[in-house]
Structure formats: C-alpha cells, structure tokens
C-alpha cells in the first residue's frame, strides 16, 4: 500500500470480532473482494481488523502459535485477505491485538493472572461467563504478547496496531512482589503497588511500539 499519504483518517470502522470457540464455520463464506468493495462504496478509508481477540484466538495463519488459531477458522488467511483487498482500494487496515484479556491464556496459565491484595485472581470468577480475567504484564505473559506482535508485523502488511485493554492494575502476584522488593518498594503498600503497576505497564508497551517504529 502507498504509505505516502499521511494523516489520521476519519471514515474509520472498528470491526469488533471477539469470536467464541463455540462458533463454527468462521469465515467459511468470506469473500475478500466483496468485503472491501462494500467498504469502498461506503467511503470507508480505514478499518480495524483482528489478529487476536479477547477469547485468545488468532485470525491469521500463525506459524509460531498454530494452537491459538481459532479452532473453527475456515479460512486461515482471513486477516491477510482483508488487508490485501482493502489495500487495493487505498483503505488502511490497522490490526487489533488484545493485551490484558485473553481467555485461552488465562485458563491455561492462571499463574500469569493479576492477584488482588487479598489473594484472589482479578477478574471473572471461574464459573461465570465472560473473558474478563486480568493478565499480569510482569509475568512471562509479556513475552507472549511481544512474540505475537512481532509475528503479525513480520508476516502481514499492517497499517498500524490497536492494543486494547492496556490498564494500570495493582497486582500482588509473585512476579510483582519480587520486582517491588528488588526496587525497595513495599508490596503491602497500595501506593507502591500502583507505582509499580505503572512501570509494569509502560515498559512493555513502549517496547511494542518501538517494534513498529
């Protein structure tokens, strides 16, 4: 795509696409040409499409994380085709990547979840519906987000990144407690937990954006 045209585009759509594994036939009838043509007719000039949703599923043909591709994604080139056909019509496609909500990871790695001061996991309880379990960016989960982001940038012609759910959350997990102690902070002090949470959030986000620049 010609990247010489600068400036923020305002005919923008956010195509929310959080898709449960219980849904089958995802993108089975997707027609990239029709998709982009409809956007062009509506004079859309930018649309956010999904690489990764809150359920933790991927919508591109990941080689690094094939187990995370949506189990019922009929067209593994969904995101690639969305981008390419939009580009043919001069439509930009920034790509969505969830950060602190990822149900797939939360279920398989509870040790990466944010822990509250009273020792509970932060977010949706185990037997309630929803994917709002908060993952801690001071855990090894940080590297996972980085690797997924790197793969998206390396394999797809994206026009930008939309990192969602990037929120300061005080945490008392072992990773945060150890980190606070190393900096001379008091993990039992809420103000110290909040200060450390800001650091925990800023460091990886700056690094991810540096990958784009």
Regions inferred by a protein language model and the residue ranges of each:
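Aromatic-lined carbohydrate-binding/catalytic grooves of carbohydrate-active enzymes
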Residues: 40-76, 101-117, 126-127, 170-180
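Aromatic-lined carbohydrate-recognition surfaces of secreted/lumenal glycan-active proteins
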Residues: 87, 91-104, 162-166, 192-213
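Proline-aspartate-enriched helix->loop->beta-strand connector
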Residues: 44, 157-161
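Conserved active-site carboxylates
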Residues: 144, 166-167
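The substrate-binding groove and active-site-proximal loops of carbohydrate-active enzymes
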Residues: 14-30, 60-77, 126-146, 186-201, ...
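Active-site-adjacent "subsite" loops/lids of carbohydrate-active enzymes
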Residues: 95, 99-156, 195, 200-203
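N-terminal structural segment of carbohydrate-active enzymes
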Residues: 1-57, 84, 89-91
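Conserved, mostly hydrophobic/aromatic
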Residues: 39, 86, 93, 145, ...
């Amino acid at each position: 795509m010609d990247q010489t045209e600068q400036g923020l585009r305002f005919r923008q759509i956010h195509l929310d696409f959080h898709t449960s594994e219980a849904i089958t036939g995802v993108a089975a009838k997707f027609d990239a040409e029709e998709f982009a043509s409809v956007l062009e007719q509506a004079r859309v000039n930018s649309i956010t499409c999904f690489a990764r949703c809150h359920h933790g599923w991927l919508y591109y043909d990941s080689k690094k994380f094939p187990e995370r591709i949506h189990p019922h994604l009929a067209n593994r080139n969904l995101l690639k085709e969305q981008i390419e056909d939009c580009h043919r019509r001069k439509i930009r496609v920034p790509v969505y990547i969830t950060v602190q909500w990822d149900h797939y990871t939360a279920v398989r790695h509870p040790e990466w979840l944010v822990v509250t001061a009273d020792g509970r996991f932060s977010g949706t309880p185990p037997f309630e519906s929803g994917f709002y379990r908060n993952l801690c960016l001071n855990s090894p989960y940080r590297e996972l987000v980085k690797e997924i982001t790197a793969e998206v940038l390396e394999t797809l012609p994206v026009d930008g990144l939309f990192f969602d759910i990037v929120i300061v959350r005080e945490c008392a997990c072992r990773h945060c407690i150890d980190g606070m102690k190393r900096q001379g902070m008091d993990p039992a002090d809420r103000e110290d937990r909040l200060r450390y949470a800001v650091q925990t959030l800023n460091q990886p986000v700056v690094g991810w954006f540096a990958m784009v620049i």
